Regions:
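Conserved beta-strand-loop surface patch within small alpha/beta domains used
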Residues: 1-83, 91-144
């Protein structure tokens, strides 16, 4: 099992993004640091424009640019710093992935262009202005 740590500064960014998008979904890309056996810390994320009440579409061009900038800022140390996956909000719904979420993440992890050993999906919403979320891991063999 993977452990994903989300530092306070990243949590604050997430809360601000969720407050700004209101009842519309928002999301982006997660980048992080390998800090121990099966343990990763989110060290950077993108916040892309909000979507609709029930969906969010990630802009691929902005995502690739953010990942490249992240790699450059970490001296391309792919062993320690890398793309972790995606995050988005479910402001009006459960923080559990929809069937569309599962499908999208399985496509990502099995895409040879992505080249990931795993991808993580974090889903958040605000409950009484506090961050509530879930984490899901997807592997290239199709398992979660």
């Amino acid at each position: 099992m993977l452990k994903i740590s989300i530092p306070t500064d990243i949590q604050i960014l997430l809360i601000k993004a969720l407050l700004k998008s209101g009842t519309h979904e928002c999301g982006g890309v997660l980048m992080g640091e390998h800090i121990g056996t099966n343990h990763f810390r989110v060290s950077s994320l993108t916040v892309q424009k909000s979507g609709t009440i029930a969906s969010f579409v990630r802009g691929i061009t902005d995502a690739i640019k953010a990942i490249r900038l992240f790699h450059k800022s970490t001296n391309n140390n792919y062993q320690k710093f890398n793309y972790l996956g995606e995050w988005h909000s479910h402001p009006l719904f459960s923080v559990q992935p929809s069937s569309k979420d599962h499908h999208t993440m399985r496509e990502l992890v099995s895409d040879p262009k992505v080249g990931a050993n795993f991808v993580v999906l974090l889903i958040f919403h605000l409950k009484n202005n506090h961050l509530e979320g879930s984490a899901h891991t997807y592997l290239p063999d199709g398992s979660c």
